C-alpha cells in the first residue's frame, strides 16, 4: 500500500501525519511475529502523539517477544476523502498494512467526543462496526482509557474493555489472545477466557433490561462472568514500565516536549473531578527515579522542554528535591521545566523564580467557583485569600498574565456565585495594581468558563446538568459584570458539553444514536470545523432517545446506574456521603491530612495509599 499512500499525500494537509518513519519508531520482522496489534488513537496524529498513555503502552507491547504494536490515528477530513475516493483502507504507520489485517485492534479512550471517530476508523478499516458482526478471532476490537469507567455507550461496538491502568493488564490480554490463537479457539471462547482476567469487561456477557420509565431495571451477567469488574492498578510506579526512548514526531504536535508522570491519583478529592476519584489510590515515583527518567528522555529526544505531569503537581512530596535535580541538568542546557497543575494554596515563589531562569511560563489557576461557599461545596479547598496571596507573589516576581478557569452549572450554584467570579477577577486586578512589577506592560487576565458535565464515579454523578438556556443566561450574567479591558473572557459552547454528558452518563441504548450519527456523517466532533449538533439531534430522534434523559434529568440515588458493573475502588457509600456534604457546603480534608475512607485502599496490595496518614 505504500505507493498508493504516497500518491495521495500531495493532496492533503500535513502529510507527515500519515507516513510514519519517525526516529525511534519500532519496526519488526513479520516472520518473527505471532500477534499484531493496531493501536488506534481516535483523533489526529498531533493529539495522539502528545498522549503519554499511548507512548507507555506502545512501549509495553513492543517489549513483548513475538508482538508488534503499530500506531493508527484518525485521518483529517481531506485524507478521509482521498481514502474513500481511492478505496484505500485505514493503515498503520509502521508497516502501512491495513488495520483489518491485524489480530487485535486497540483503542484508547480519553475523551467522549472521540466516540464517533472510533466508528469511523472501524469503517475505514473495512471492519464491521457492530461487535456481533465480527465473527472470527482476527480483528478483535478492545478499548481502554479513563472513559471506559462507563463503557456502555460503546458496548455494541467493542468486543471487550480493559478497565484501569494498562501496563500489566495489556500484557495479560495479549498472552491470553496468543494462547487462544494457538489453541484455535473461537472468538466467543476467547472472550470468555479474557473475562477471567482482572479488569476485563466483556459487554456481550451482560444483559441490560429497562423499566417502563426508561431507567435500568437490571444488569444480568452470564454464568461465569463477574458481577462487577474491578479496575487494574499498577502497585509500584518506580518499577513500572516508563518509556525514555520514545518516538520523536516528524511534524509539530500539540505537546511537543518530554512528559514525565510523577504520580497517579490526587489527595484533594474535588467533587467534580472524575480523574481524581478514578485514579485512586495515590501512588508516587521517587525523585531519584524521576530524575533518571527525565534525563534519559531528554538526551534521547533532544526536546527543549519537559513537563511534570500529574493531577496536582505541587502536591508531590519530593517536589523541591525533584526540581533541584532537574534544574541542575536543565539550566545549563536551556531546557525549560514546566509545572502544570499548580495550586494556589501551595505556590512556591522561590521555585517558580528558579524555573523562570530558562523561560517564564504562563501562570494558570483553576479556582473553579467564584465564592467560598461554592468552593467548599465542590471541595476545592482553596480560599480567596490564598488565591490573592499567590497572585501577589507571582506579580511581584515579574508575572504579568494569569489564566483563570471556572465552571458554570455546578450543583448548588446561584447567581451570587456567578457574579463572584467577576468580583474575584477585580480583586486580582487590584492585587496587580498593588504588587505588579513592570507595570508598563499591564496585566492580562484570560478567563474561561466551562459548562459543567457530571461524570460517573464522582459525588455529582446523580445531579442534573443545567439546561443550555440556563447556562447561557449565566454566561451573559458574568459578561455583564466584566468591564475591565485587561480581561479576555471565553466560554465553552453548550452543545458540545451537552453531548459529552450524554456519552459520559449514557446507557447501552446510546450506542444506537451513535450509530445513527455515524450514518449521518458525524466524526471529529471535538473539532469546531466538524461538529454538527443538528445531525446529532437527528440521530437521537432516529434512535428514539431524548438527550435530556441523560443530561437535565437527575439520577435517583437508588437508581441502577449504567456503569454499576465497573468497580473503580471508590465506593458508592463514600460518594453519597460526599454528595450530602456538598449540599451542606461542607468540605472534606485532603487524604494527606485524614483518610476519608473512600474505599480505594482495598485495591492496594499494601492496603494503603502512598499519601495516607499513619494508622
Language-model regions, residue ranges each:
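Radical SAM enzyme core and accessory elements
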Residues: 1-27, 31, 37-39, 483-615
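N-terminal [4Fe-4S]-dependent radical SAM core
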Residues: 8-38, 45-46, 203, 209, ...
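N-terminal pre-triad scaffold of radical SAM enzymes
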Residues: 37-43, 61, 248-274, 298, ...
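Conserved SAM/AdoMet-binding glycine-rich loop
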Residues: 40, 113, 296-403, 408-446, ...
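Canonical Radical SAM [4Fe-4S] cluster-binding loop centered on the CxxxCxxC motif
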Residues: 51, 252-288, 597-612
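Short secondary-structure boundary/capping segments
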Residues: 54, 86, 122, 156-161, ...
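Glycine-rich beta-alpha loop elements in corrinoid/cobalamin-binding modules
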Residues: 74-222, 459-507, 514-528
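Flexible glycine/acidic-rich beta-alpha junction loops that bind and position SAM and/or redox cofactors
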Residues: 77-78, 153, 207-211, 317-318, ...
Amino acid at each position: 500500500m505504500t505507493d498508493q499512500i504516497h500518491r495521495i499525500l500531495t493532496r492533503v494537509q500535513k502529510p507527515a501525519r500519515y507516513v510514519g518513519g519517525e526516529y525511534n519508531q519500532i519496526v519488526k520482522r513479520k516472520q518473527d511475529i505471532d500477534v499484531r496489534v493496531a493501536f488506534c488513537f481516535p483523533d489526529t496524529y498531533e493529539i495522539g502523539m502528545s498522549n503519554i498513555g499511548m507512548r507507555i503502552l506502545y512501549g509495553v507491547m513492543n517489549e513483548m517477544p513475538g508482538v508488534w504494536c503499530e500506531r493508527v490515528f484518525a485521518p483529517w477530513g481531506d485524507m478521509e476523502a482521498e481514502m474513500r475516493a481511492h478505496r484505500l483502507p485505514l493503515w498503520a504507520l509502521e508497516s502501512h498494512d491495513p488495520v483489518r489485517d491485524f489480530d487485535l485492534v486497540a483503542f484508547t479512550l480519553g475523551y467522549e467526543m472521540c466516540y464517533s471517530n472510533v466508528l469511523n476508523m472501524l469503517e475505514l478499516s473495512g471492519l464491521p462496526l457492530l461487535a456481533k458482526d465480527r465473527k472470527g478471532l482476527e480483528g478483535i476490537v478492545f478499548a481502554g482509557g479513563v472513559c471506559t469507567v462507563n463503557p456502555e455507550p460503546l458496548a455494541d461496538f467493542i468486543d471487550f474493555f480493559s478497565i484501569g491502568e494498562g501496563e500489566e493488564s495489556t500484557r495479560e490480554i495479549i498472552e491470553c489472545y496468543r494462547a487462544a490463537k494457538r489453541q484455535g479457539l473461537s472468538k466467543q471462547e476467547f472472550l470468555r477466557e479474557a473475562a477471567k482476567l482482572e479488569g476485563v469487561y466483556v459487554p456481550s456477557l451482560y444483559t441490560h433490561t429497562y423499566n417502563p420509565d426508561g431507567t435500568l431495571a437490571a444488569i444480568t451477567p452470564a454464568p461465569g462472568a463477574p458481577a462487577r469488574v474491578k479496575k487494574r492498578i499498577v502497585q509500584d510506579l518506580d518499577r513500572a514500565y516508563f518509556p525514555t526512548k520514545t518516538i520523536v514526531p516528524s511534524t509539530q504536535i500539540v505537546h511537543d516536549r518530554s512528559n514525565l508522570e510523577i504520580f497517579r491519583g490526587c489527595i484533594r478529592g474535588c467533587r467534580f473531578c472524575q480523574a481524581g476519584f478514578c485514579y485512586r489510590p495515590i501512588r508516587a515515583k521517587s525523585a531519584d527515579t524521576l530524575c533518571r527518567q527525565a534525563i534519559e528522555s531528554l538526551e534521547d529526544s533532544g526536546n527543549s522542554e519537559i513537563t511534570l505531569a500529574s493531577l496536582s503537581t505541587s502536591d508531590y512530596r519530593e517536589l523541591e528535591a525533584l526540581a533541584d535535580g532537574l534544574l541542575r541538568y536543565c539550566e545549563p542546557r536551556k531546557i525549560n521545566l514546566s509545572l502544570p497543575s499548580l495550586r494556589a494554596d501551595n505556590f512556591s515563589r522561590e521555585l517558580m523564580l528558579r524555573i523562570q531562569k530558562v523561560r517564564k511560563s504562563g501562570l494558570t489557576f483553576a479556582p473553579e467557583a467564584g465564592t467560598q461557599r461554592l468552593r467548599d461545596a465542590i471541595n476545592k479547598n482553596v480560599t480567596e485569600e490564598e488565591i490573592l496571596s499567590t497572585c501577589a507573589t507571582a506579580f511581584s516576581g515579574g508575572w504579568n498574565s494569569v489564566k483563570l478557569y471556572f465552571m458554570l452549572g455546578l450543583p448548588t450554584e446561584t447567581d451570587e456565585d456567578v457574579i463572584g467570579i467577576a468580583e474575584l477577577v477585580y480583586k486580582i486586578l487590584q492585587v496587580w495594581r498593588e504588587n505588579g512589577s513592570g507595570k508598563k506592560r499591564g496585566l492580562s487576565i484570560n478567563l474561561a468558563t466551562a459548562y459543567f458535565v457530571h461524570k460517573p464515579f464522582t459525588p455529582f454523578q446523580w445531579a442534573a446538568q443545567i439546561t443550555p438556556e440556563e447556562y447561557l443566561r449565566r454566561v451573559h450574567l458574568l459578561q455583564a459584570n466584566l468591564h475591565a479591558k485587561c480581561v479576555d473572557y471565553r466560554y465553552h459552547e453548550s452543545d458540545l458539553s451537552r453531548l459529552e454528558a450524554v456519552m459520559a452518563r449514557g446507557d447501552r441504548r446510546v450506542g444506537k444514536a451513535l450509530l445513527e450519527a455515524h450514518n449521518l456523517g458525524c466524526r471529529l466532533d471535538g473539532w469546531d470545523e466538524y461538529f454538527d449538533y443538528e445531525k446529532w439531534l437527528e440521530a437521537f430522534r432516529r434512535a428514539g432517545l431524548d438527550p435530556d434523559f441523560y443530561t437535565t434529568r437527575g439520577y435517583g440515588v437508588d437508581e441502577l446506574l449504567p456503569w454499576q458493573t465497573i468497580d473503580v475502588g471508590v465506593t458508592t457509600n463514600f460518594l453519597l456521603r460526599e454528595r450530602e456534604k456538598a449540599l451542606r457546603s461542607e468540605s472534606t480534608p485532603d487524604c494527606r491530612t485524614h483518610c476519608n475512607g473512600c474505599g480505594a485502599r482495598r485495591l492496594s496490595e499494601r492496603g494503603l495509599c502512598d499519601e495516607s496518614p499513619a494508622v
